[in-house]
Amino acid sequence: MDGGNQSEGSEFLLLGMSESPEQQRILFWMFLSMYLVTVVGNVLIILAISSDSRLHTPVYFFLANLSFTDLFFVTNTIPKMLVNLQSHNKAISYAGCLTQLYFLVSLVALDNLILAVMAYDRYVAICCPLHYTTAMSPKLCILLLSLCWVLSVLYGLIHTLLMTRVTFCGSRKIHYIFCEMYVLLRMACSNIQINHTVLIATGCFIFLIPFGFVIISYVLIIRAILRIPSVSKKYKAFSTCASHLGAVSLFYGTLCMVYLKPLHTYSVKDSVATVMYAVVTPMMNPFIYSLRNKDMHGALGRLLDKHFKRLT
């Protein structure tokens, strides 16, 4: 398995962050705990929003979809990683690796685009409150979400198809927790210039443009908030954006730690940074969006109260 060219029938070895059995046991329980917290947190957000008519608004519509994306994202990577940590067989098939890569790339892009749309929603709510209902109509919300999905699916498809033309030689040991694009490209022994060029071009379109849009939106939002004469209204306006700003900072901060570096400098140490955006960010989002949100507190309280009453 260590020599020759990559074929569809061959495999990769996902070695994870450590090959020490003792450390692997610790990592297993740590990632299992994080996975369960992520699943429970995001499922509760989705159920609370879908079951409470008071939360059937654009901002919560996009939040529910962000939670669904995060739920799908961790399920794409962590279960396989947990199996590998408990098993002596750490192999993942070529097809399995490409499938994992496709969903990973697509869902990161989708997360990014939904955060950009949520920034636009906050901009309209703060800067144009009188036009909010018409500017963020249900039809437009569905259209924006559909556009996010289409662009993300195409983005993932482009990079996965390009990866199929890459040849891998020598060791196929991946010192990572999942099949990550930069790691696979580093293992290639064929020309990856096209992959690299397309990665930069599509990355600018899918990530940099939405990120710039988020920055501009928040500059305008902060300007609008500073013009509000009442201190209490200023605080209320800022608090409605604080959770989204926290999620944006966590997402882009962890993403920059991994991807804002030359391809040839990618190292095993980057696996820790990858865990931040692949595991920690989806786990933290439910806490960020519900911690200081009274509407979400109320919806979660009513949801849990209703289910506890059914049990008693």
UniProtKB/Swiss-Prot annotation:
PROSITE patterns reported in the protein's UniProt record: G_PROTEIN_RECEP_F1_1, G_PROTEIN_RECEP_F1_2
Key words, A-Z: Cell membrane, Chemotaxis, Disulfide bond, Fertilization, G-protein coupled receptor, Glycoprotein, Membrane, Olfaction, Receptor, Sensory transduction, Transducer, Transmembrane, Transmembrane helix
Main location: membrane
Tissues expressed in: Expressed in testis. Expressed in spermatozoa (at protein level). Expressed in olfactory epithelium.
Resulting phenotype, residue 230 to A: Abolishes nuclear translocation of ARRB2
Glycan attachment sites: 5, 195
Sequence ranges on the Cytoplasmic membrane side: 50-57, 121-139, 220-236, 292-312
GO cellular component: plasma membrane
Membrane-topology descriptor: Multi-pass membrane protein
Extracellular side: 1-25, 80-100, 159-196, 260-271
Subcellular location: Cell membrane
Function: Odorant receptor which may be involved in sperm chemotaxis. Bourgeonal is a strong chemoattractant for sperm in vitro and is shown to be a strong agonist for OR1D2 in vitro. May also function in olfactory reception.
Name of this protein: Olfactory receptor 1D2
Originating species: Homo sapiens
Lineage of the species this protein comes from: Eukaryota, Metazoa, Chordata, Craniata, Vertebrata
Gene name, Swiss-Prot/TrEMBL: OR1D2
